[in-house]
Amino acid sequence: MTITIVIFLCIILLYFIIGVFDIQKNIFVESKNSVTKGQICLTFDDGPDKIMTPKILKILNKYNIKGTFFLIGKNIKNNEDLVKKISCEGHSIGSHTFSHEILFPFLSKKKMFTEIKQTNDIIKKITGKKIIHFRPPFGITNINIK
């Protein structure tokens, strides 16, 4: 049992190393944006969080700055008010999958789609807005996500 776990972890580590050193394998998702030269995008992952999200929103409000929040579907439960607040304050919201599965790159195409759609549907139900942004967990994906 222990040897199986070690082998499995080594395979995962190898997968990430290959992705880092051979970017042309398209393991990392391509970023498509329309940022003008001299601008930056502020993004926040893994929310909403009862402690950190309000602090971030307060700072952004203080300086009249907008950001993009990539939310995890399972974190939205009991935090719907924060999702609504993010949206009402003019920030963008994107999906960061439902469960933030560490093995996301190894999931089937169907399971990946479900992870993304489930979160998109929850966010749309709360905000009324269609979700167009997606960030895979750990920034890593596979050929099924383009």
Where are these regions (language model features)?
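Active-site beta->alpha N-cap acidic-glycine motif
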Residues: G19-L107, K111, E115-I131, P136
